[in-house]
Design a protein with these regions (language model features):
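C-terminal motif of bacterial Sec signal peptides marking the signal peptidase cleavage site
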Residues: 14-17
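A short, Trp-centered hydrophobic/proline-enriched beta-strand micro-motif
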Residues: 52-74
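Structural recognition of beta-strand segments within beta-rich domains
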Residues: 74-101
């Protein structure tokens, strides 16, 4: 029961507060060659008026494979769970795990298709919104800036490197002067984490690396 409640809250945070548009479902069908030229076939509404396509995996900044604790909030509700995350320039994979390490849901993205499989969620949930948030944190900042600029939005990134070797990078998405989302990437000796705050949709979550 506990995990069912957590999944319902997670659904509210990442799916039900948003709507999306998939070009495959539009009246204009594209050939595979046209889709390659345009990039991802999935769009995400960052605001109620502006949508952006998902970037392709080749825009991933390096590669990462890690277990993370996900802690989040949506309104007055809070949740926490464990996840496994892998991403490189070919694909992205994410698995949601229970307290015993059992897979309770999985997401994958290879540039052509977003797949989300879980008995806990309806099949029509918008998994591309999870992909978009992950891209905002992990993908190349120049590629993100260009993508948002094409959608009429702005993307900023400021990285601070300390003498200790630790670093903090803050990424922000704006609609004109209105702050839509803020992503903080902390790479420290005691903590490696990503905090995502979406001011428009009213959700926040933090991903903290689990020590090996």
């Amino acid at each position: 029961m506990k995990h069912k409640i957590v999944f319902v809250l997670l659904a509210g945070v990442l799916f039900f507060s948003c709507t999306s548009l998939n070009r495959q479902n539009s009246s204009k069908q594209e050939t595979s060659g046209e889709a390659d030229a345009l990039g991802s076939q999935y769009f995400v509404y960052v605001t109620n008026r502006h949508k952006v396509p998902l970037l392709l995996p080749c825009d991933m900044d390096g590669s990462v494979e890690t277990y993370q604790v996900m802690e989040g909030s949506y309104g007055n509700q809070h949740f926490s769970m464990l996840l496994y995350f892998f991403s490189d320039q070919n694909e992205m994979q994410l698995s949601l795990l229970n307290d015993f390490g059992t897979d309770m849901g999985s997401l994958s993205y290879d540039g052509r298709e977003v797949r989300f499989e879980s008995a806990m969620f309806p099949k029509n949930l918008k998994a591309e919104y999870i992909v978009c948030d992950i891209q905002n944190a992990y993908y190349d900042s120049a590629a993100l800036e260009a993508n948002y600029k094409n959608a009429g939005l702005s993307f900023e990134s400021v990285r601070t490197l300390y003498e200790t070797g630790e670093s903090v990078e803050v990424r922000k998405i704006f609609e004109e002067k209105k702050l839509i989302e803020e992503i903080m990437l902390k790479n420290g000796r005691e903590e490696q984490s990503i905090t995502i705050k979406n001011y428009l949709r009213g959700y926040e979550y933090k991903l903290t690396k689990v020590e090996d």
